[in-house]
Curated annotation (Swiss-Prot):
UniProt keyword annotation of Transmembrane present: yes
PROSITE patterns, per database record: G_PROTEIN_RECEP_F1_1, G_PROTEIN_RECEP_F1_2
Residue spans crossing the bilayer: 26-49, 58-79, 101-120, 140-158, 197-219, 237-259, 272-291
Protein's name according to its UniProt entry: Olfactory receptor 1D2
The species this protein was found in: Gorilla gorilla gorilla (Western lowland gorilla)
Cellular-component GO terms for this entry: plasma membrane
Amino acid sequence: MDGGNQSEGSEFLLLGMSESPEQQQILFWMFLSMYLVTVVGNVLIILAINSDSHLHTPMYFFLANLSFTDLFFVTNTIPKMLVNLQSQNKAISYAGCLTQLYFLVSLVALDNLILAVMAYDRYVAICCPLHYTTAMSPKLCILLLSLCWVLSVLYGLIHTILMTRVTFCGSRKIHYIFCEMYVLLRMACSNIQINHTVLIATGCFIFLIPFGFVIISYVLIIRAILRIPSVSKKYKAFSTCASHLGAVSLFYGTLCMVYLKPLHTFSVKDSVATVMYAVVTPMMNPFIYSLRNKDMHGALGRLLDTHFKRLT
């Protein structure tokens, strides 16, 4: 397993966060519980939105797609992690590692872009309510979502293709929970300057520009809310944005904990922060968006009531 270029038959060893059998058992049950909560929560959000005509609006259209992305995101990483925690064989093939990396990178970018589009939706709803129906037409919503998908797919392809040019030497042991770009680049023995340059350039375009757009949108939203004379209307306007603002803060906060640092300082200690954006954020999003949302409460109640009646 030493030296030379990777071939299709070569493997990495995903050792995870701990090599202690006792700790691995604890981690297994913890991640299994979090995975099941994430799957159930996001599936319920998708089903509730699809089954309730009152939720067939741009905001919930994007929320359903965000839930689908989060569902896909955790399914890309956690099942393999659970298998590794219960197995002595912790190997992942080179092709499997790159596949996991591709979906990881693409889906993080997609999550980011959808959150930016949702910020625009909230801006139009609060700042231009009279033009909301025309400004957020079904055609525009589909166009915006399609653009998010195209950009995220291209972003993932660029970095995955560049990773195939990297040579790995020495130990193939990855003290991490999945195949993560920074971890793989730290293991490289070839020149990764082009990877690093492209990572910064594309990262600024895919992450910093949407993040800046989100910040500007919320500055304008808060200004508009403060101008509303009625206290009850202020509260209603803010409550429609609070859940999205919470999701944005959680997503970017955890992402910054991992990636807002030089590549050479990246270490296995960052795996804890990675768990936050890779596992905790997708798990928390359904709770954040439904906690104080009466429309979502009603839709979920009707959905569960219908299914319980069918069972009885």
